[in-house]
């Protein structure tokens, strides 16, 4: 998409989406008055996983299904119904789900930015699921927070083994990064009781009005101010929480 935008401005960029990108310099850029940025596949994917986790029925519009193919394939493998149209997808999950294995890979493989949300989903799927993180190190910090909610997850290096439990329990948890925060929101939607997620400034980096969009789908979620008398953990800057 960046290459398309630059070419719209008069740049000469070839090979976008391949292993080799060739750029020929030009004197100046300009002339592209309007450009529509492609939809965020990770935001769309997060809503898809949330729909599956809550056994919901959700239609997402203004998406590019082919950008979501790795996630769609894994959701279907787990037993989730995913219908595709030109610019929308429908996610339905009414029956029992099955455990799956996931390996993160560079695009067009399964995105590392979706494995935390899938870990939350798989935490209540009966059986054993395995997640292998091939992109980044220390990408499983959310596992400790999910375990506060009753999840059974064992992490060894780049490998996480998820043993599905019947139900998660609401708890006070902390977002350690952007995608971990999104995963905890998914977990909170599934859990019995109230879940409080601190450090939501991480979530705000990648999701605009997340709680409002979820409320439109029927979720009971709101943003609450911190009690200033409570000391911040690890000197983190904490301004609000999602409940």
Curated annotation (Swiss-Prot):
Associated pathway: Cell wall biogenesis; peptidoglycan biosynthesis
Compartments, record wording: Cytoplasm
Catalytic reaction equation(s): phosphoenolpyruvate + UDP-N-acetyl-alpha-D-glucosamine = UDP-N-acetyl-3-O-(1-carboxyvinyl)-alpha-D-glucosamine + phosphate
GO molecular function terms noted in the UniProt entry: UDP-N-acetylglucosamine 1-carboxyvinyltransferase activity
Chief location category: cytoplasm
Class of the enzyme per the UniProt entry, highest EC level: transferase
Any one cellular-component term (Gene Ontology): cytoplasm
Record has Cell division as a keyword: yes
Enzyme nomenclature, EC number: 2.5.1.7
Keyword ATP-binding carried by entry: no
Biological-process GO terms, alphabetical: cell division; cell wall organization; peptidoglycan biosynthetic process; regulation of cell shape
Residue positions binding UDP-N-acetyl-alpha-D-glucosamine: 113, 135
Keywords linked to the UniProt accession: Cell cycle, Cell division, Cell shape, Cell wall biogenesis/degradation, Cytoplasm, Peptidoglycan synthesis, Transferase
Cited function: Cell wall formation. Adds enolpyruvyl to UDP-N-acetylglucosamine.
Similarity-based family: Belongs to the EPSP synthase family. MurA subfamily.
Name of the protein: UDP-N-acetylglucosamine 1-carboxyvinyltransferase
Provenance organism: Desulfofundulus thermocisternus
Organism placement in taxonomy: Bacteria, Bacillati, Bacillota, Clostridia, Eubacteriales
Gene designation per UniProt: murA
